[in-house]
Structures are given as structure tokens and as C-alpha cells.
């Protein structure tokens, strides 16, 4: 790796032991020989896991890289605007993080007599993290060199001529690391999900196997195909890991109140320790100097911190009615912003701002309320920010509600971040079973039905929905409903792009651009604005021929120009190809 040949970046830790000598020189005696040293080093590696930053929205706005959010600062990859250097940062980040993990393995010298369960669990965390970062690179680049050993600054150019493993070999390596992790890790209950644990490793393994299994199925006849199609093997691994996960006694989080409240609590709470469904999560505390600004951004109506944006009508239309029936998006009722949310899947109501929902504490934010504007009522009317400025402006009429802390007034954000949930495992199991044609009532009850009933949606046997997303190939009703459920359950959590890539879903991207709510003159949405703001909206917001918001019509007149023969993978950085002559560039780059 070029960055290895040039220099090894320093890795900071709170441990005095690790601060004494550069970690790139293990020969100097920097061995990890005791429990405290091991724990301090592993604690530092947690910085590489997903987090909310002190600025911006983090994962909440990440899905502008998909069909869930449309943004003025759109994703270059979707529009075919990546270049040969577009993968450089992801490549470097991935291998730098792997370098840090492998430094641990290289210098782990704890005597066997001192390897108690706690020390071994820390070692399991390292295996998990090595799997995690190889998976990240696999998704982005496909076939990659496996970094299963420590490459220090003394590595020679000749020593770095390492061929890439085929993608299925990489996936097998990742799963083998997760077997090691699972066998060493404590269960979730030991640290209430605040540390990497056995159950989190199982769900990560299911996600890896599902990704590879479906990639190999749907890309079997294109330039991104694996040299050996092992789709059924990997899908079978999802089932194997899932069967073990089912034995762990985990339940979906529920409350005795409104079903939607349980789903919302997963994302708007400060403490997730009592929610066993959240297998791994990140805690924030101003008292400990660890906080974020997600609450402040959501309070302001921000969907993308880089500019104006909005949740798409496509995502809104994905959700079922609460009685389990499909919606007909052509029904006139959906031209009414308020009626759009009535009688729907409670997850829609908890994910997208709607009538009566608060952007923050009621003491500082007026609940969203649409009503025909009059001077007498102007102080109680609070429509979406279609007439806003900068990044508070909505392009579609749909703001983010997921994660809003309705007790937040001002200052630092402290809502926790779920990293891995049990629900992901249920969705992976359901999809693998359907792909393997082993769907049954028992599997439905454990997965799809359980998720819908927790959300407050009646479970109906899957049937064909004529209005469901057209992927360009035939889906069984079961797969249709599983894909719908993934989008509903995992919206705005960073999964959608990965799903589109593994499903070979370029038909949902090429020539498409996200649209928004109905904004005709007679709509309650439009009538809720003052005359000045109505004029402003008409000057700034493009509508399609049927009066639905089409905000990117001028910028993307022909829709996204994703290159289906190239953009499913990122380009390997030119510097890496120059250094390692055994690497081969990805298709069409």
C-alpha cells in the first residue's frame, strides 16, 4: 500500500505505554503484554467505528447517495461524475484502520496464564474490527488485497506486491475472522451493548454473507461477477449464523404504548443499554466531552448540512398502510400533505416530519402544522421549510424526524447512535431464506411478521404490488415485501446504497431524480405559506407537469447518469496501481 511505503500514521491512545515509542517499531519492545495495555489499545480502535460528528448530521444525511434523499449537493457517483481518484480516501482510510488492528495482533504478547475471559474478549474485538474494515473495502472495491498481517514502515516495494483476493475469497476471510470474534467475545449483556460483543459479530457476519451472496447472484452475468459464483454458499451462511443468533434470546424492543414510540426510541434516546435489540451503540455525554450537533441540525430542519435537500417521495411511498395493505400512490388523497401520513406504517410517521410532530422541545419549536394561511393564524402555522434558506431549506417538503430529541432545547446533542441492531439480522435471514426458496410461515413469523407487528403494522401474506419499485427484473411477492421492509426499517441509517449496489439496481438510478410532495396551488401544503413565501416558492421550486416537487429538474434534466458498467465499484487509486503491479483496476476505470 502506498501509504505503508511512505509512512505509518501515528495512532494516539490514552495509554502512556503506547505513547512512549512509535507504534511502527515493534522491535523497540512495544509489546501488549497486560490487560490494561490491551484494553487501552482496543479502546482507541473504537474511534474508527461509525459516529456522529460535532458538526453535521452524520449517517442521517448519508443517504443522499441513494434514492432516499435528494440534495442540491448531490452524490457525484450517482451522476457518473467519479474520477480515477474518487476511491483514494476510502482506500486509505480502510487500510490505515486495518494497519492499526494488525499492529495489535503483531504485538499481542499476553502470557497464556493471564488470558482471562476479559482479555480474550478484547482480542475478539480486534477480530471484529478487522472483519469490519475488510467488509467496508469489499463493498467499495470488490477484489482487494487481504491485510492479514502487520506491514510496517520497513516493508519493501517487492514485499508489497500483493495480489488481490477474489471477492468471494475476501468474504470467506471476513467470515473466518468473525468466527474467531464470536468464539472470544462476551455476550451483549456484559457491557449492555457499549462494547463489541458476540451477538453484534453474528449480525455483522449475516450482513457480510448476505451482501456477497446477493452480489454474486445479481451480478452473475456482468463485469462485476465473481470468478466463482458462490451465491448459494453465502446465502446459506446467513441462515447458519441466523440460526445461532436466534438461540441468543434477543427480542425486538417494544413498549406498552404506541408501537411507533418503540421504534422512535431506538434513535432519539440517550441511553440504549436497556434496549437489547441494539446490539452495539455509541454513547454521547457532554459531561465526558463527547457530543454532537445532530439535534441542533434536526431542530433547524436540515436534511443535508452541505445544502438544501429533502427526503424523496419515493421513500414516503414505500411505506404500507398500518392495516398491512399497499398504498396506491396515484390516489388523489396523497396530494394532501396531511393525509399522506394518515393510517400509515408508524415508522413513516417517526421517520419523516408530519402534522403535529416537533423539531425539538415544544418550548423552542412550534409543532408542524399546516392550515390555510391568515394573519390571525400565522403564529401557529408551521409548514415544511420550502421557503427556507441554505441547508435549512427543504427541496421536497419532507424533513427528517428520525432521531429528533423532543426534549432538546439548545446546546450539545447527546442522543445515542445505534451501530448494529438485531433487526438487521432478521432482515438478512428473511432475505436469504427467500432467495434460497426456503420461505415458510415459521420464517415469516420470526422475521417479517415480527418486525411489522413491533412497528404497529398488521402482517398480511405477501402479494404482488403493481406499484412497487421496478428493479428491471422479476421479484417474487416475498422478495418484494422483504425489500420494502428493509427500506422502511433501515431508512436514513446508511444501508440504502449498499442494497442498491448488491441488487444491481441501476434502473432505480439511471435517468431518475428524486421528487417531492404535491405543491399545486390548491394544496394545503402551498396554502400554508404567506403570500410572500408562496411567491418565493414558485420562483425557486420547480414542479413537474402534475405539480409534484421536481427540485433537480434544472440541474439533472436527464436524471442521474450513473454508469452501470463502471460505477458499481470505486476505482483503485492510481498510486496503489503504480506501487503494486499485481493489482488490477476495476472495470471501465
Q: Across the structure, where does each feature detected by a protein language model lie?
A:
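A glycine-rich, coil/turn loop motif that links secondary-structure elements
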Residues: 117-124, 190-201, 257-259, 470-472
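Long, intrinsically disordered, low-complexity segments
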Residues: 94-97, 173-175, 259-321, 412, ...
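Structural register within alpha-helical repeat arrays
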Residues: 123, 130, 205, 212, ...
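Conserved, well-structured interaction surfaces
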Residues: 34-50, 71-141, 157-193, 337, ...
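C-terminal motif of bacterial Sec signal peptides marking the signal peptidase cleavage site
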Residues: 11-13
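An aromatic- and glycine-enriched ligand-binding surface/loop that stacks and positions planar moieties
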Residues: 15-74, 144, 148, 180, ...
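C-terminal substrate/ligand-recognition segments
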Residues: 341-453
Amino acid at each position: 500500500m502506498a501509504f505503508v511505503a511512505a509512512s505509518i500514521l501515528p495512532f494516539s491512545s490514552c495509554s502512556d505505554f503506547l505513547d512512549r515509542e512509535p507504534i511502527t517499531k515493534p522491535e523497540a519492545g512495544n509489546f501488549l503484554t497486560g490487560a490494561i495495555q490491551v484494553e487501552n489499545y482496543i479502546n482507541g480502535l473504537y474511534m474508527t467505528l461509525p459516529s456522529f460528528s460535532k458538526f453535521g448530521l452524520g449517517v442521517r444525511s448519508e443517504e443522499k447517495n441513494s434514492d432516499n434523499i435528494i440534495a442540491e449537493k448531490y452524490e457525484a457517483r450517482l451522476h457518473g461524475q467519479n474520477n480515477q481518484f474518487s476511491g483514494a480516501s476510502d482506500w486509505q482510510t480502510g487500510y490505515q484502520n486495518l494497519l492499526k488492528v494488525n499492529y495489535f495482533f503483531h504485538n499481542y504478547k499476553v502470557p497464556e496464564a493471564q488470558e482471562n475471559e476479559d482479555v480474550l474478549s478484547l482480542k475478539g474485538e480486534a477480530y471484529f474490527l478487522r472483519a469490519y474494515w475488510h467488509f467496508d473495502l469489499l463493498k467499495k472495491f470488490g477484489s482487494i488485497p487481504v491485510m492479514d498481517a502487520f506491514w510496517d514502515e520497513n516493508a519493501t516495494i517487492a514485499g508489497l506486491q500483493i495480489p488481490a483476493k477474489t471477492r468471494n475469497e475476501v468474504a470467506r476471510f471476513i467470515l473466518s475472522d468473525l468466527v474467531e470474534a464470536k468464539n472470544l467475545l462476551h455476550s451483549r449483556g456484559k457491557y449492555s451493548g457499549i462494547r463489541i460483543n458476540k451477538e453484534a459479530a453474528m449480525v455483522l457476519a449475516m450482513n457480510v454473507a448476505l451482501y456477497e451472496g446477493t452480489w454474486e447472484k445479481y451480478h452473475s452475468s456482468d463485469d462485476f461477477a465473481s470468478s466463482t459464483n458462490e451465491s448459494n454458499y453465502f446465502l446459506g451462511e446467513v441462515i447458519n449464523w441466523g440460526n445461532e443468533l436466534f438461540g441468543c434470546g434477543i427480542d425486538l424492543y417494544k413498549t406498552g404504548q404506541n408501537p411507533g414510540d418503540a421504534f422512535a426510541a431506538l434513535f432519539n434516546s440517550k441511553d440504549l443499554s436497556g434496549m437489547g435489540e441494539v446490539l452495539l451503540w455509541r454513547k454521547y455525554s457532554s459531561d465526558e466531552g463527547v457530543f454532537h450537533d445532530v439535534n441542533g441540525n434536526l431542530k433547524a430542519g436540515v436534511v443535508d448540512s452541505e445544502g438544501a435537500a429533502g427526503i424523496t417521495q419515493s421513500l414516503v411511498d414505500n411505506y404500507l398502510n398500518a392495516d398491512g395493505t399497499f398504498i396506491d400512490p396515484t390516489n388523489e388523497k396523497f396530494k394532501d400533505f396531511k393525509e399522506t401520513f394518515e393510517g400509515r406504517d408508524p415508522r413513516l410517521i417517526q421517520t419523516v416530519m408530519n402534522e403535529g410532530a416537533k423539531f425539538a422541545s415544544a418550548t423552542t419549536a412550534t409543532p408542524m402544522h399546516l392550515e390555510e394561511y391568515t394573519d390571525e393564524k400565522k403564529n401557529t402555522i408551521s409548514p415544511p421549510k420550502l421557503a427556507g434558506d441554505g441547508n435549512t431549506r427543504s427541496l421536497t417538503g419532507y424533513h427528517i424526524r428520525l432521531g429528533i430529541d423532543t426534549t432538546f432545547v439548545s446546546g450539545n446533542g447527546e442522543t445515542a447512535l445505534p451501530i448494529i441492531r438485531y433487526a438487521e439480522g432478521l432482515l438478512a435471514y428473511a432475505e436469504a431464506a427467500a432467495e434460497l426458496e426456503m420461505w415458510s410461515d415459521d420464517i415469516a413469523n420470526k422475521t417479517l411478521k415480527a418486525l411489522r407487528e413491533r412497528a404497529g403494522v398488521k402482517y398480511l401474506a405477501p402479494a404482488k404490488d403493481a406499484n412497487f419499485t421496478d428493479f428491471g427484473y422479476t421479484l417474487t411477492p416475498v422478495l418484494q415485501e422483504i425489500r420494502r421492509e428493509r427500506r422502511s426499517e433501515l431508512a436514513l441509517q446508511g444501508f440504502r446504497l449498499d442494497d442498491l449496489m448488491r441488487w444491481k439496481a441501476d434502473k432505480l438510478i439511471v435517468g431518475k431524480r428524486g421528487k417531492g410532495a404535491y405543491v399545486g396551488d390548491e394544496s394545503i401544503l402551498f396554502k400554508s405559506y404567506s403570500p410572500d413565501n408562496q411567491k418565493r416558492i414558485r420562483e425557486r421550486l420547480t414542479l413537474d407537469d402534475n405539480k409534484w416537487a421536481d427540485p433537480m429538474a434544472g440541474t439533472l434534466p436527464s436524471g442521474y447518469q450513473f454508469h452501470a458498467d463502471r460505477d458499481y465499484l470505486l476505482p483503485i487509486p492510481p498510486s496503489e496501481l503504480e506501487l503494486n503491479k499485481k493489482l488490477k483496476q476495476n472495470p471501465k476505470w
